[in-house]
């Protein structure tokens, strides 16, 4: 039973808008805006539009979140609110889990850190302390769990284009097997960056 949904998509930043645009045949494709793609053969992509992380997170939190994780947390907020779980005092948070999938994870974070390292090798290895926590593909699940204080099963799923489907199947099975009462599940990706487009 699906009780709540959230969405940040190339055709809308919530479920209602995404659905309306989908049934009306609106395309999410457009020129790439996340970086200068003028030297790439492909110069269009389906980006999430009109999203500004600063509208959803304070500065400290933004330092900890790759864009893909920002998308995941914002969509999870929508889903939790839609399900009526946000202020449910009867909810046993030890029996609420989170499984969020990503085909890649923090690609932009990886690009930034690898580039910074390459340019500063003479000064010795230096990385942002948030490099690994921002990049790993299961961190979105962790941030959602921390925000809502959910203490049930928590992990990420990585299986290329099937990642989100597998996350939903895993979440269903955890409920079916009695390991959780409620699961927040889905997927997020933010791979429209040079390595994602050119790789």
Question: Which residues make up each language-model segment?
Answer:
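ACP-dependent fatty acid/polyketide chain-elongation machinery
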Residues: 1-61
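A glycine- and small-residue-enriched flexible loop/hinge segment at structural boundaries
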Residues: 34-85, 137-151
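Acyl-thioester C-C bond-transforming condensing/cleaving domain
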Residues: 13, 17, 23-32, 62, ...
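Structured loops at beta-to-helix junctions and adjacent beta-edge loops in soluble globular domains
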Residues: 5, 101-103
């Amino acid at each position: 039973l699906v009780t709540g949904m959230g969405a940040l998509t190339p055709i809308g930043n919530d479920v209602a808008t995404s659905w309306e645009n989908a049934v009306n045949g609106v395309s999410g494709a457009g020129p790439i805006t996340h970086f200068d793609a003028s030297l790439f053969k492909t110069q269009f992509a389906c980006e999430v539009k009109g999203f500004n992380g600063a509208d959803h997170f304070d500065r400290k939190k933004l330092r900890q979140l790759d864009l893909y994780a920002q998308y995941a947390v914002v969509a999870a907020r929508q889903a939790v609110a839609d399900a009526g779980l946000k202020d449910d005092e009867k909810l046993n948070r030890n029996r609420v889990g989170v499984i969020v999938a990503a085909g890649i994870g923090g690609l932009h974070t990886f690009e930034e850190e690898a580039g910074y390292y390459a340019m500063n090798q003479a000064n010795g290895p230096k990385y942002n302390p948030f490099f690994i926590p921002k990049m790993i593909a299961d961190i979105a699940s962790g941030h959602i769990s921390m925000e809502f204080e959910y203490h049930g099963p928590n992990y990420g799923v990585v299986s290329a284009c099937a990642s989100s489907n597998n996350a939903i199947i895993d979440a269903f099975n955890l409920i079916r097997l009695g390991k959780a009462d409620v699961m927040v599940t889905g997927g997020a990706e933010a791979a429209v960056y040079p390595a994602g487009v050119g790789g």
